[in-house]
Regions:
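N-terminal Rossmann-like NAD(P)+-binding domain of SDR-like oxidoreductases, especially those catalyzing
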Residues: 1-186
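C-terminal substrate-binding subdomain of Rossmann-fold SDR/epimerase-dehydratase oxidoreductases
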Residues: 206-344
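Residue-level signature of the cytosolic catalytic core of signaling kinases
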Residues: 63, 199-200, 271, 320
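Short-chain dehydrogenase/reductase
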Residues: 100, 149-157, 193, 197-201, ...
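Residue-level signal for pocket-adjacent positions within structured domains
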Residues: 9, 84, 88, 94, ...
């Protein structure tokens, strides 16, 4: 029998790509998602891509009784990959309580239910935001956790602590915390990609929608930072490369190969790229010109961060393999697909 994995937020951007990779690796996947920032159509597209239809339950992770019922319905769930969260830095500054409730209580509910239902492990979707503005770059897993620059970043820090404290108390759970950098791009089939409800909060969907003429112009938030061109620098990782890291982490937990009950890995490329460099690479890679403007700095943004992924490279045998050019072309192909389908 295939091992059952629960994926929260599985119709979301990173979640949907990870479900495909899990199914391709032989896992049976159950998705729960409240569809607040995604659509049930994603389940159809996962089936088209992988040839397998995952089980899907529309559910909010804040619903403790509902979660309990899902674990009871799908007996024998071995582990969880927890993506479900509110994730926009700027919005979190404006709506901190929404972020604290959604992101903290959802994890607490899962951790309370895991021992009851014999769930062995959790792969947690953490973030490079836990490092704040690092003292040294590239940033390693040993870098100090800084005061968060946004409520979103703070929820990731607190959630990491909640997991550590829960396991330290003797809970029969193992965890891997994956600190992602900036996932971008879309599945090579152009059947899965980033499709936020409403105005995009992330750079790439806003960029591709601007290139398509859906948005008038792209705002670059700040050109006076202490970077070569004045715009923020990030480590942009292809979403399928990131999804594969989750499968490797899941294998590691279930094969009992962890060195500690809680392990942390940076998941990035090791290359920093400024927002303006990214725009120019998009234009060069696709031949599409972008209408962009410089706007004031945005609250909660850090200046520059990129990963030292060497620990994940050596310990997990994982590496980001896809070039930034191919990644950006995949994002544009996805946007073109949405236009052809009349979705956007």
């Amino acid at each position: 029998m295939k091992e059952r994995i629960l994926v929260t937020g599985g119709t979301g951007y990173i979640g949907s790509h990870t479900v495909v990779e899990l199914q391709n690796s032989g896992y049976e996947v159950i998705i729960i998602d409240n569809l607040s920032n995604s659509s049930a159509d994603v389940v159809d597209n996962i089936e088209k891509v992988s040839g397998i239809r995952p089980a899907f339950e529309k559910l909010d992770c804040l619903d403790f009784a509902g979660l309990d019922a899902v674990f009871a319905k799908y007996k024998g769930i071995k582990a969880i990959i927890h993506f479900a969260a509110s994730k926009a830095v700027g919005e979190s500054v404006e709506k901190p309580l929404l972020y604290y409730r959604n992101n903290l209580v959802s994890l607490i509910n899962l951790l309370e239910l895991m021992p009851k239902h014999g769930v062995e492990g959790i792969v947690f979707s953490s973030s490079c935001t836990v490092y704040g503005q690092p003292d040294e770059l590239p940033v390693t897993e040993k870098a100090p956790i800084k005061k968060a620059e946004s409520p979103y970043g703070n929820t990731k820090q607190i959630n990491e602590e909640i997991i550590r404290d829960t396991i330290a108390s003797g809970a029969p759970i193992n965890a891997i915390l994956l600190r992602y950098f900036n996932p971008i791009g879309a599945h090579p089939t152009a059947l899965l990609g980033e499709l936020p409800n409403g105005v995009p909060q992330n750079l790439i969907p806003y960029l591709t929608q601007t290139a398509m003429g859906i948005r008038e112009k792209l705002s670059v938030f700040g050109d006076d930072y202490d970077t070569p061109d004045g715009s923020c620098i990030r480590d942009y990782i292809y979403v399928v490369d990131l999804a594969k890291a989750h499968v490797i982490a899941m294998n590691r937990i279930l094969e009992d190969k962890q060195k500690d009950k809680v392990e942390v890995f940076n998941v990035g490329t090791g290359r920093g790229l400024s927002v303006l460099e990214l725009i120019h690479k998009f234009e060069e890679s696709t031949g599409v010109k972008l209408n962009y403007q410089i706007a004031p700095r945005r609250a909660g943004d850090i200046v520059k961060v990129w990963a030292d992924p060497s620990y994940a490279n050596s310990e997990l045998g994982w590496k980001a393999e896809t070039s930034i050019e191919d990644t950006l072309r995949s994002a544009w192909k996805w946007q073109v697909h949405l236009r052809e389908k009349g979705i956007m």
